[in-house]
């Protein structure tokens, strides 16, 4: 589904590279390495005149080519660094032809710094308009961090959506819920109005014949889901090891079983569904089922390998040989996933892990008990990562309409004494962001959050019994809790064309938006196409980030209800810990 986006990005990048003729060096911003790897291979770069890629930092490679390309984001720091390089070239009397490729677009700050440094005329600045990175066949990401400012996040989201429409046509319909969904719709309309004014009333682009609509999912309506521990395979992997641009870093011995120790450099392993059928099959299953599932795959592969003994005729042997490469690749993938699963299982044996899951379930179930505070004390005494502790506090604050002052004071003291006094700043940052709140009413021991109570009474968020092996309900993703964001979004899809349900949708918390692109398009285009007959294709856009469990929940609905075919775009992939880390101060900067 994202193939067109990748092909377009690849063509544009190679065109920019080829505009610099001959051999050239590529200096790459380190944080963009995963993104570049999603678009082109090292071999492709070599075919286009780049024999080697260097990291873009203060050190200039000794064997740099006479023509140099910088690939970076248009930040103040990068502009200063480019200027430092150019001045060094001048001091060394090197005639280096420098080209800067920024993504997705340049900006006034970047170019102003280059001008003030006196190097703007010494280089060429071009743009690689990669607004969203294709991470998988059904997933695009803007790769924005959780700390991205509101205005910038909304503008980048709007730009990415419009760029997607340039390839696939304008969405006939925009639906969603929440303040950021409403603001993004306003930005979309404003952009197209400005375009119409410039083009004398004409707006570029035809109505999409591929997509039914875009569904805006506002993270601010569901802060709960990211703070829970993800229990799907990919979700748990992201929690424990971290997934970057659909790659996970592993010890060399895990990738290559011939290496005896873990002392070698870490290696990347692709989690893209296109890289392995096994990966696609297991990415969304509940982690409790990963062992039996991998055993089942191992037995099947073993049976397939036995086919070589049964191959007797030339045709049978030829058929087996044609499959051998694929079988060996899947066998390697199975070994790596088995090693990953073993690593994750070891984490579940930590003395705080089960208490953490129990505490989270108590909070989302609205259990009126002080048990959760006793459990949190035990988790702190077990010296669980500080991010986990703050996740629980934020979860408690959201689900119980704020924390009592004495509880905030108690945990501020416990956390600073256990993890460091600089976390006083973390506390304040979370309070300023509204993730930790002081309860206004103190006469109820554990007052329920009005908004969360509304959602809890509206949707079956919590399930006491869930079939994790053969799931029928999205609550399998958290072993008893179904992501609120998915319930809200899917309710809109099912109810927006039902007159009886529209009033209910309009009266629920969070601004409800549902707008047709053009009045005359209230009848869907007759040539609307999907990969599966009878299904309506929808782009689900997560404003503020999404988790792998939410993707798994949508995919389950896609499979079970057979009504929609989803493509996902998100401002970034998040976990509760990555959200918390955005509020933790940098110790090094504090010591300067």
Swiss-Prot record:
GO terms for biological process: intracellular protein transport; vacuole fusion, non-autophagic; vesicle-mediated transport. GO terms for molecular function: ATP binding. Gene3D superfamilies: 1.25.40.850, 3.40.50.1910, 3.40.50.2060, Syntaxin Binding Protein 1, Chain A, domain 2. This is Vacuolar protein sorting-associated protein 33. Belongs to the STXBP/unc-18/SEC1 family. InterPro entries: Sec-1-like_dom1, Sec-1-like_dom3a, Sec1-like, Sec1-like_dom2, Sec1-like_sf, VPS33_dom3b. Essential for vacuolar biogenesis, maturation and function. Involved in the sorting of vacuolar proteins from the Golgi apparatus and their targeting to the vacuole. Keywords: Protein transport, Transport. One of its GO terms (cellular component) is vacuolar HOPS complex. It comes from the Eukaryota.
């Amino acid at each position: 589904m994202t193939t067109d986006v990748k092909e377009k990005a690849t063509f544009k990048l190679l065109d920019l590279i080829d505009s610099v003729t001959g051999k050239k060096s590529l200096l790459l911003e380190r944080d963009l390495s995963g993104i570049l790897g999603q678009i082109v291979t090292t071999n492709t770069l070599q075919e286009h005149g780049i024999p080697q890629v260097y990291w873009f930092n203060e050190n200039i490679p000794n064997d740099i080519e006479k023509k140099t390309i910088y690939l970076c984001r248009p930040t103040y720091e990068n502009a200063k660094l480019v200027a430092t390089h150019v001045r060094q070239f001048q001091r060394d009397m090197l005639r280096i032809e420098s080209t800067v490729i920024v993504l997705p677009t340049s900006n006034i700050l970047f170019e102003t710094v280059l001008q003030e440094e006196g190097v703007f005329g010494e280089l060429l600045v071009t743009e690689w308009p990669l607004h969203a990175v294709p991470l998988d066949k059904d997933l695009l990401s803007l790769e924005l961090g959780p700390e991205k400012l509101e205005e910038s996040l909304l503008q980048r989201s709007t730009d990415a959506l419009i760029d997607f429409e340039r390839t696939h046509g304008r969405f006939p319909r925009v639906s969603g819920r929440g303040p950021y969904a409403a603001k993004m719709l306003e930005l979309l309309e404003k952009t197209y109005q400005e375009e119409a004014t410039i083009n004398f009333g004409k707006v570029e682009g035809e109505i999409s014949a591929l997509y039914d609509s875009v569904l805006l999912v506002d993270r601010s309506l569901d802060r709960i889901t990211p703070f829970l521990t993800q229990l799907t395979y990919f979700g748990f992997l992201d929690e424990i090891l971290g997934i970057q641009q659909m790659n996970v870093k592993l010890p060399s011995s895990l990738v290559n079983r011939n290496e005896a120790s873990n002392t070698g450099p870490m290696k990347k392993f692709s989690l893209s569904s296109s890289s392995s059928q096994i990966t696609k099959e297991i990415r969304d299953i509940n982690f409790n089922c990963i062992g039996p599932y991998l055993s089942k795959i191992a037995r099947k592969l073993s049976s397939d390998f036995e086919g070589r003994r049964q191959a007797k005729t030339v045709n049978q042997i030829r058929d087996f040989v044609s499959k051998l490469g694929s079988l060996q690749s899947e066998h390697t993938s199975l070994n790596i996933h088995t090693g990953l699963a073993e690593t994750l299982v070891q984490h579940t044996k930590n003395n705080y892990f089960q208490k953490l899951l129990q505490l989270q379930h108590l909070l989302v179930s609205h259990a009126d008990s002080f048990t959760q505070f006793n459990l949190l004390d035990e988790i702190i005494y077990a010296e669980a990562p500080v991010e986990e502790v703050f996740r629980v506090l934020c979860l408690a604050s959201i689900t119980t309409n704020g924390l009592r002052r004495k509880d905030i004071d108690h945990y501020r003291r416990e956390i600073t004494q256990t993890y460091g006094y600089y976390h006083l700043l973390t506390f304040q940052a979370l309070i300023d962001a509204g993730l930790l709140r002081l309860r206004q009413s103190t006469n109820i021991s554990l007052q329920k959050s009005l908004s969360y109570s509304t959602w809890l009474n509206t949707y079956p968020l919590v399930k006491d019994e869930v079939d994790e092996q053969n799931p029928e309900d999205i609550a399998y993703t958290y072993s008893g809790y179904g992501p609120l964001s998915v319930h809200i979004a899917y309710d809109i899809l099912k109810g927006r064309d039902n007159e009886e349900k529209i009033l209910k949708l309009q009266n629920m918390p969070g601004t409800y938006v549902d707008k047709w692109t053009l009045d005359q398009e209230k009848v869907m285009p007759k040539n609307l196409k999907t990969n599966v007959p009878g299904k309506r294709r929808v782009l689900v856009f997560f404003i503020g980030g999404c988790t792998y469990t939410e993707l798994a929940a949508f995919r389950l609905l896609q499979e079970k209800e057979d009504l929609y075919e989803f493509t996902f775009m998100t401002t970034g992939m998040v976990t509760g810990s990555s959200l918390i880390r955005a509020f933790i101060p940098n110790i090094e900067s504090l010591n300067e």
